[in-house]
Design a protein with these regions (language model features):
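P-loop NTPase switch module centered on the Walker A-proximal segment
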Residues: 1-98, 102, 142, 210-213
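Conserved nucleotide-binding/hydrolysis micro-motifs of P-loop NTPases
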Residues: 15, 27, 31, 77-78, ...
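Active-site phosphate-binding and catalytic loops of NTP-dependent enzymes
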Residues: 30-57, 80, 146-159, 190-203, ...
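Conserved catalytic-core segments of large NTP-driven translation/proteostasis enzymes
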Residues: 148-282, 401-404, 465, 470-472, ...
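Long insertion/accessory domains within large nucleic-acid-processing enzymes
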Residues: 255, 260-263, 440, 453-454, ...
């Protein structure tokens, strides 16, 4: 019987957890020396690498001194809250990874809180001690305070701390004495993290995660809670409504390195993947068909935000996408529901419109961005928060937001947040920076990030996470400027843009194709105006001498997907295609728009 340790890794964005796992895989001699591997083997989807965030949790395992260590990488961002809880269910302990300079960050707190409630035993790793002016001792104190505030037990507070640098590939129990390998970390894992309890009896396994392969369909992943599962055995699947469906396990796989290994049986305490089970949901229990005993289901965080998805019906429809019809989009959203748990989709019976519910703008924009790269064309409406009735009161989601800025900008930021119905909860100074915590309605966060960065000259570090539902806070002012709208379709000319510069700022480059009703810029005043950007210089006027030789154009504002979603108004869509992103009015024709506004 192999000895097993199941650990989850908890860390803030960019504190180096994926790099650390790479090094642990190296230490477990997973790769032959001649096999060159890329950096960041875990974040294997392009989007994750670009943003440096882990979206989906993944499992890998390493063998060390006859122990099998299952490592579960958790997403750090609370927009993927549904992922976090399930993942922690498979672990017996956790590695809390903290940056030696920044200390524990708010998003770490979110995952850590869940881990402590589940009673996992932590091992703290203070990473990046090779950086200049880091402060490992202070950070260790901060971690202790944080755990204390999260109501950790005495046993949890008595945690071991390992210092090191994942990038340079060393870990040590004392940060002033660097070593040349990460063995001390592996030893600490084996010494401090409890082994899984082995329970004899009828088999039980809670399905906590799933994988999808076009070859065998959906694959259930979970940790065997009790007994053992064998290939080809009959099992009962306990559903949400209490019914039990008899099924048979076709194949069993355990995790071995980055891949999987087919095995005949899996004993309790190990993590495995089952092939051949149909129609299961996350939270169902695999158990004995004759006297089923379901395990307690996991609650997955409710969505707090919704957006409208619809087919692209702009004049440039189908120019650069492969999948453009409503059937394609419907199928793609169905497929996403298989993997993405915190997502809900509701179809409008009359039109090709879907309302997609998710955990926040980040969660939904990751989905849109993924679809865009796969060659889909679609349009998305303004993000709306989900309002609930609680005890007859209208309630809205409120988030805990932390902003870290240099001292001189703090008053500006406080002013900006309180205008959006946020309230300052705490404030403390570290050197010349100030860390502030606010409670702010989710509505107020939409579109806030760009403003905060502008006001603080790009210095602010901002992160937020869902807190709870609170009574409705009243109206919030959104962007007050109107839009500049293209009058007719065609190519935008520098000559026309130059003449219109004093009207506002533009979002388009000269020589770009535009269509009537497209939002091409932001008006300096608060009303929408229709401008003609397709006007070129008349031929007869070419030789007239004058000061109009050069058009001097201020460079246009370029939006990322999230910024565009946060920027648009309720009567606008973002049109997303594989090569372009445009903003447009929902009603393209000017006369019809005026009629609708009356």
């Amino acid at each position: 019987m192999q000895k097993i340790r199941n650990i989850a890794i908890i860390a803030h964005v960019d504190h180096g957890k994926t790099t650390l796992v790479d090094k642990m895989l190296m230490a477990g001699h997973l790769f032959r020396d001649n096999q060159s591997t890329g950096e960041l083997m875990l974040d294997n989807n392009d989007l994750e690498r670009e943003r440096g965030i882990t979206i989906l949790s993944k499992n890998v395992s390493i063998n060390y001194n006859g122990y099998k260590i299952n490592i579960i990488d958790t997403p750090g961002h609370s927009d993927f809250g549904g992922e976090v809880e399930r993942v922690l269910n498979m672990a017996d302990g956790c590695l809390l990874l903290v940056d030696a300079f920044e200390g524990p960050m708010p998003q770490t707190r979110f995952v850590l809180q869940k881990a402590i409630q589940m009673g996992l035993k932590p091992v703290v790793v203070i990473n990046k001690v090779d950086k200049p002016n880091c402060r490992p001792e202070e950070v260790n104190e901060m971690v202790f305070d944080l755990m204390f505030n999260l109501d950790a037990t005495e046993e949890q507070l008595d945690f071991p701390t390992i210092y090191g640098s994942a990038k340079q590939g060393w870990m040590s129990e004392d940060w002033q004495k660097p070593t040349d390998n990460i063995i001390p970390l592996l030893d600490a894992i084996i010494k401090y993290i409890p082994e899984p309890q082995v329970l004899e009896g009828m088999p039980q396994m809670l399905i906590t995660s799933l994988d999808y392969s076009s070859y065998v369909g959906r694959i259930a992943i979970g940790r065997v809670h009790r007994g053992e599962l064998r290939e080809g055995m009959e099992i009962g699947l306990c559903k949400k409504d209490g019914t039990v469906v008899k099924q048979r396990i076709k194949e069993l796989h355990t995790f071995e390195g980055m891949g999987r290994k087919k095995v005949e049986s899996v004993k309790s305490g190990d993590i495995c993947a089952l092939v051949g089970i149909e129609g299961f949901e996350i939270g169902d229990t695999v158990t004995d068909p004759n006297n089923p005993e379901p395990l307690q289901r996991i609650a997955i965080d409710e969505p707090t935000m919704s957006m409208v998805f619809t087919i692209n019906d702009s004049p440039f429809f189908g120019k650069d996408g492969k999948y453009v019809t409503s059937r394609h989009i419907a199928e793609r959203l169905e497929r996403e529901l298989d993997k993405n748990l915190a997502l809900r989709v509701k179809k409008d019976p009359n039109e090709d419109v879907w309302t997609v519910y998710g955990r926040g703008v980040l969660h939904l924009s990751v989905l849109i961005e993924t679809m865009r790269r796969e060659g889909y064309e679609l349009q998305v409406g303004q993000p709306q928060v989900i309002v609930k009735e609680i005890d007859g009161q209208k309630c809205e989601p409120v988030e805990l937001m932390t902003v870290n800025v240099p001292e001189e900008y703090s008053s500006k930021i406080i002013d900006m947040v309180t205008r959006r119905r946020g309230e300052l909860v705490s404030m403390n100074t570290q050197n010349d920076r100030i860390q502030m915590e606010f409670h702010i309605p989710s509505r107020g966060i939409i579109g806030l990030r760009t403003n905060v960065l502008t006001a603080s000259a790009g210095e602010a570090i901002m992160s937020h996470q869902f807190l709870e539902y609170q009574p409705w806070k009243g109206d919030i002012e959104r962007r007050t400027n109107g839009s500049l709208i293209a009058m007719e379709g065609g190519t935008a000319f520098a000559y026309a843009i130059d003449k219109l510069q004093d009207r506002g700022r533009f979002f388009i480059f000269p020589q770009e194709e535009v269509y009537a009703g497209q939002v091409v810029g932001e008006n300096a005043k608060d009303n929408d105006i229709v401008v003609n950007v397709t006007k070129s210089k008349k031929l007869t006027n070419m030789r007239a001498s004058g000061a109009d030789d050069k058009a001097r154009i201020i460079p246009p504002v370029v939006f990322s997907l999230e910024e565009a979603l946060e920027y648009i108004k309720a009567d606008e869509y973002v049109e997303v295609t594989p090569n372009h992103m445009r903003m447009r009015k929902i009603i393209l024709d000017e006369l019809e728009r005026k009629r609708a506004n009356r």
